[in-house]
């Protein structure tokens, strides 16, 4: 049974803060944005969180393909910033989009790859015949401590994917995962901001896992980078995905459509899935997309995706990634700190 993407949707908050504005407050060098290849990032409104972002992305996915929500048999929401420690985000999504009560829900966590883990879980349930459609979501309102390196990129946004076996806009030809116990990034319960290993998050974490998963999938399928029209890699900044693509043999032209981090920052669980959505926004029938996520802790999920003729029927029925990027409203650090709850008494 072929399994793949029936529809997709994204949501990116309209508020933005320039990386240079953050650097100004902390007295950092002026070229930090160029060094990161991230120039601004998305900031949630005062009433936005992972749940509201997930709902908006899911609504866009439902409306794009005119899907009956009652057909959805599973909702898996991946995030590292769920609004409740004990209360599922997915139940909020299900109620908001009008699902029947005959569906299973679980919230997933695996740092920035929780969304692709949700996608794999939906694939398994659909392929087994247990459900008709699954809804996989990756969304975050990520946090970085004031003055920490993470603050320049930690952003907000999310993407939702409806997974099924019929009416596919893109078939998932295969998936492969690579996982180890690598403590490059962590946050204990009750601690407001995560800690990280600095440069340790690069070679032994991001690059090792992304490259291992990517090479594993290409070996499994007997494919090479030149067999793909596009490639999407997790985007913690604008440098890592460009570098890992080159190491694997992909070109800058292949990754350009999905490289959105310079404009919206690192949306964590939404990062890879928003990059995929940006690519689907312009991919043509018959073209192939290679996707690899990364989550600290650490692991990567790789996917080989082939776009079908149906993409042209539904693509323009909901806002695309570039539509959200275009409606930016800029704020200063004081308002940003208020929006992010950084002012604590």
Swiss-Prot record:
<comment type="pathway">
    <text>Metabolic intermediate biosynthesis; (R)-mevalonate biosynthesis; (R)-mevalonate from acetyl-CoA: step 2/3.</text>
</comment>
<protein>
    <recommendedName>
        <fullName>Hydroxymethylglutaryl-CoA synthase</fullName>
        <ecNumber>2.3.3.10</ecNumber>
    </recommendedName>
</protein>
<comment type="similarity">
    <text>Belongs to the thiolase-like superfamily. Archaeal HMG-CoA synthase family.</text>
</comment>
<feature type="binding site">
    <location>
        <position position="243"/>
    </location>
    <ligand>
        <name>(3S)-3-hydroxy-3-methylglutaryl-CoA</name>
    </ligand>
</feature>
<dbReference type="GO" id="GO:0019287">
    <property type="term" value="P:isopentenyl diphosphate biosynthetic process, mevalonate pathway"/>
</dbReference>
<feature type="binding site">
    <location>
        <position position="234"/>
    </location>
    <ligand>
        <name>(3S)-3-hydroxy-3-methylglutaryl-CoA</name>
    </ligand>
</feature>
<feature type="active site" description="Proton donor/acceptor">
    <location>
        <position position="80"/>
    </location>
</feature>
<feature type="binding site">
    <location>
        <position position="29"/>
    </location>
    <ligand>
        <name>(3S)-3-hydroxy-3-methylglutaryl-CoA</name>
    </ligand>
</feature>
<feature type="binding site">
    <location>
        <position position="239"/>
    </location>
    <ligand>
        <name>CoA</name>
    </ligand>
</feature>
<keyword id="KW-0414">Isoprene biosynthesis</keyword>
<dbReference type="GO" id="GO:0004421">
    <property type="term" value="F:hydroxymethylglutaryl-CoA synthase activity"/>
</dbReference>
<dbReference type="InterPro" id="IPR016039">
    <property type="entry name" value="Thiolase-like"/>
</dbReference>
<keyword id="KW-0012">Acyltransferase</keyword>
<dbReference type="InterPro" id="IPR013747">
    <property type="entry name" value="ACP_syn_III_C"/>
</dbReference>
<feature type="binding site">
    <location>
        <position position="153"/>
    </location>
    <ligand>
        <name>(3S)-3-hydroxy-3-methylglutaryl-CoA</name>
    </ligand>
</feature>
<feature type="binding site">
    <location>
        <position position="199"/>
    </location>
    <ligand>
        <name>CoA</name>
    </ligand>
</feature>
<keyword id="KW-0808">Transferase</keyword>
<feature type="binding site">
    <location>
        <position position="201"/>
    </location>
    <ligand>
        <name>(3S)-3-hydroxy-3-methylglutaryl-CoA</name>
    </ligand>
</feature>
<feature type="binding site">
    <location>
        <position position="296"/>
    </location>
    <ligand>
        <name>(3S)-3-hydroxy-3-methylglutaryl-CoA</name>
    </ligand>
</feature>
<dbReference type="Pfam" id="PF08541">
    <property type="entry name" value="ACP_syn_III_C"/>
</dbReference>
<feature type="binding site">
    <location>
        <position position="266"/>
    </location>
    <ligand>
        <name>(3S)-3-hydroxy-3-methylglutaryl-CoA</name>
    </ligand>
</feature>
<feature type="active site" description="Proton donor/acceptor">
    <location>
        <position position="234"/>
    </location>
</feature>
<comment type="subunit">
    <text>Interacts with acetoacetyl-CoA thiolase that catalyzes the precedent step in the pathway and with a DUF35 protein. The acetoacetyl-CoA thiolase/HMG-CoA synthase complex channels the intermediate via a fused CoA-binding site, which allows for efficient coupling of the endergonic thiolase reaction with the exergonic HMGCS reaction.</text>
</comment>
<dbReference type="GO" id="GO:0010142">
    <property type="term" value="P:farnesyl diphosphate biosynthetic process, mevalonate pathway"/>
</dbReference>
<dbReference type="InterPro" id="IPR004656">
    <property type="entry name" value="HMG_CoA_Synthase"/>
</dbReference>
<comment type="function">
    <text>Catalyzes the condensation of acetyl-CoA with acetoacetyl-CoA to form 3-hydroxy-3-methylglutaryl-CoA (HMG-CoA). Functions in the mevalonate (MVA) pathway leading to isopentenyl diphosphate (IPP), a key precursor for the biosynthesis of isoprenoid compounds that are building blocks of archaeal membrane lipids.</text>
</comment>
<feature type="binding site">
    <location>
        <position position="112"/>
    </location>
    <ligand>
        <name>(3S)-3-hydroxy-3-methylglutaryl-CoA</name>
    </ligand>
</feature>
<feature type="active site" description="Acyl-thioester intermediate">
    <location>
        <position position="112"/>
    </location>
</feature>
<dbReference type="GO" id="GO:0003985">
    <property type="term" value="F:acetyl-CoA C-acetyltransferase activity"/>
</dbReference>
